[in-house]
C-alpha cells in the first residue's frame, strides 16, 4: 500500500564520515566537497571524521573502534545523524544505523535530495524521481527506519515535498511508468533536434564540474537570465539559448547539469536524455574553475563522465574560468582538448577570444562559396544570411556578387557553377 507521510522542516546537524584507503589529502578534499553538498541540502556539518583503512568494511563501512568514537561524538555534539562520503550498500546502511542508533545517510542521498529540490521541468522531475526510486528500492528497510527517526530532512525530499513509501512491487511499477514517460520526452527532444539539424543550426554544450561557472558563462554570452548561484548543482534542468556571432552565424548554447566526483551511476543513467544534448552537439565547451585547488581532479572527473556517456569525439574547447580569482602561478593546460581559452565569466575578460574561437571553428566546418547571383536568385542570399556567414555582398550590373561560408549540405543547392573550395 502507498503511504504518504507529510514532512516538516528540521535543522539537521550531521557528522561527515569518510574512509581513506590511500591518499588522505584526497579524502579531506572529498569531505570538504561533501560539506558543501550538505550545506546546499540545508544541513550543517558539525564535525568531520576520516578513518584510514586498507579497505572499506563490507558490513559496516567503518571499523568497530571508529564506530564507537563516532557514537560518542554524536552525543557530545548533539548531532542528528551522520553522512558517509561513499554510497552505502543496503547492509552497510542497516548495520551502521543499528550500531550508532541514529539517522545514517550517504553521499548519494544528499545529491539526490539536492536534485529533488532543484528540478523544475517535467523531464527533470521524472529523472530525479527515477534515480531516487532506483536507489531506494534496494534499501527500503534501512531507509524506512532511518528516515522515520526525524520525519524529514536530507533524503526525504521528492515530488510535492512528501516522502513516498512503497513496497518493492509498487516501486517496480512506478519505475516502469517513469521510464515510459522519459521515453516520450526523449522522442520529443529527438524531434526538436532533427528540426535544428534541418535548419542547419550548430550547437555547443556547456559541460563542467559543478559550480565551475557554466550558467554565469551562458548568461554573459546570451543574457539568458539563468539563476547563477555560488552553489553546487545550481543548474539541474538544461537551458538552451541562441548566440549570434559577430559574422552573423547563429549557434545554440546549452547549459547542462554539473558533474561531481562519485556521481552515482543511476544518476548518470537517469539523466542520459538530458546529457544527450552534449552527445549530439557539434562543440563541447568544458568550463573549468581554475581558481579551485582541485582543478586537475575536477577535469579528470569530467572527462571520465564524458567517456562513460560515449562523448569523446567532439571538438573540445577547455574554458579556464575565474582567472580573476586564480593564483598568478597556476599552470593552465589541458592536453585532452583541441582548444583552450582563459576567461572570467564574472568580469567578461577573455570572452571576445572565446567568441572569435567559436566563429573560427564553425567557419572551418563550412565550405567557401563565391559567385554572382541573378537578381531573381536573391532568395538564395537570404538562405546564406540565415545559415551561413556572408562575407561580402556587392550589387553589380549583371547580378549580386557574394562570397560566404555555407554549410556543406547546402552548398550544392547554392553553388551551381560557383567557384568554391573547402577552407
Curated annotation (Swiss-Prot):
Residues given in the record as Mg(2+) binding sites? 215, 235
Q: Which PROSITE patterns match?
A: G_HFLX
Q: Which is a Gene Ontology cellular component entry for this protein?
A: cytoplasm
Q: Provide the protein's localization.
A: Cytoplasm
Protein name per UniProt: GTPase HflX
What species is given as this protein's source?
Lacrimispora saccharolytica (strain ATCC 35040 / DSM 2544 / NRCC 2533 / WM1)
Tree of life domain: Bacteria
Gene symbol here is hflX
Q: What does this protein do?
A: GTPase that associates with the 50S ribosomal subunit and may have a role during protein synthesis or ribosome biogenesis.
Q: Does the keyword Metal-binding apply?
A: yes
Q: Which keywords accompany this UniProt record? A: Cytoplasm, GTP-binding, Magnesium, Metal-binding, Nucleotide-binding
Amino acid at each position: 500500500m502507498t503511504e504518504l507521510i507529510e514532512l516538516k522542516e528540521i535543522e539537521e546537524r550531521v557528522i561527515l564520515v569518510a574512509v581513506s584507503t590511500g591518499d588522505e589529502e584526497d579524502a579531506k578534499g572529498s569531505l570538504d566537497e561533501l560539506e558543501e553538498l550538505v550545506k546546499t541540502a540545508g544541513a550543517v556539518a558539525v564535525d568531520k571524521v576520516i578513518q584510514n583503512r586498507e579497505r572499506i568494511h563490507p558490513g559496516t563501512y567503518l571499523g568497530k573502534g571508529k564506530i564507537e568514537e563516532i557514537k560518542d561524538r554524536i552525543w557530545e555534539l548533539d548531532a542528528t545523524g551522520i553522512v558517509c562520503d561513499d554510497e552505502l550498500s543496503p547492509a552497510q546502511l542497516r548495520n551502521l544505523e543499528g550500531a550508532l542508533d541514529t539517522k545514517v545517510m550517504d553521499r548519494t542521498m544528499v545529491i539526490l535530495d539536492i536534485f529533488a529540490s532543484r528540478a523544475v521541468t517535467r523531464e527533470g522531475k521524472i529523472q530525479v524521481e527515477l534515480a531516487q526510486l532506483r536507489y531506494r528500492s534496494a534499501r527500503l528497510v534501512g531507509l524506512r527506519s532511518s528516515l522515520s527517526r526525524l520525519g524529514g530532512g536530507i533524503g526525504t525530499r521528492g515530488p510535492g515535498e512528501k516522502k513516498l513509501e512503497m513496497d518493492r512491487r509498487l516501486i517496480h511499477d512506478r519505475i516502469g511508468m517513469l521510464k515510459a514517460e522519459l521515453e516520450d520526452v526523449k522522442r520529443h527532444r529527438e524531434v526538436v533536434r532533427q528540426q535544428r539539424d534541418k535548419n542547419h543550426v550548430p550547437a555547443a554544450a556547456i559541460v563542467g564540474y559543478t559550480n565551475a561557472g557554466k550558467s554565469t558563462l551562458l548568461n554573459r554570452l546570451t543574457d539568458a537570465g539563468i539563476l547563477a548561484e555560488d552553489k553546487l548543482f545550481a543548474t539541474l534542468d538544461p537551458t538552451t539559448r541562441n548566440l549570434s556571432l559577430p559574422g552573423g552565424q547563429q549557434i545554440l548554447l546549452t547549459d547542462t547539469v554539473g558533474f561531481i566526483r562519485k556521481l552515482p551511476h543511476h544518476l548518470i543513467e537517469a539523466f542520459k536524455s538530458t546529457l544527450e544534448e552534449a552527445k549530439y552537439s557539434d562543440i563541447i565547451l568544458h568550463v573549468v574553475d581554475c581558481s579551485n585547488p582541485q582543478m586537475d581532479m575536477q577535469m579528470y572527473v569530467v572527462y571520465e563522465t564524458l567517456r562513460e556517456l560515449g562523448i569523446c569525439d567532439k571538438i573540445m574547447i577547455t574554458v579556464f574560468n575565474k582567472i580573476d580569482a586564480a593564483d598568478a602561478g597556476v599552470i593552465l593546460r589541458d592536453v585532452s582538448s583541441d582548444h583552450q581559452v582563459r576567461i572570467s565569466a564574472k568580469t567578461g575578460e577573455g570572452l571576445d577570444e572565446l567568441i572569435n574561437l567559436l566563429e573560427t571553428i564553425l567557419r572551418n566546418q563550412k565550405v567557401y562559396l563565391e559567385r554572382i547571383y541573378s537578381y531573381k536568385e536573391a532568395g538564395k542570399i537570404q538562405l546564406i544570411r540565415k545559415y551561413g556567414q556572408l562575407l561580402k555582398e556587392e550589387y553589380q550590373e549583371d547580378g549580386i556578387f557574394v562570397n560566404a561560408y555555407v554549410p556543406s549540405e547546402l552548398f550544392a543547392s547554392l553553388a551551381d557553377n560557383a567557384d568554391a573550395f573547402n577552407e
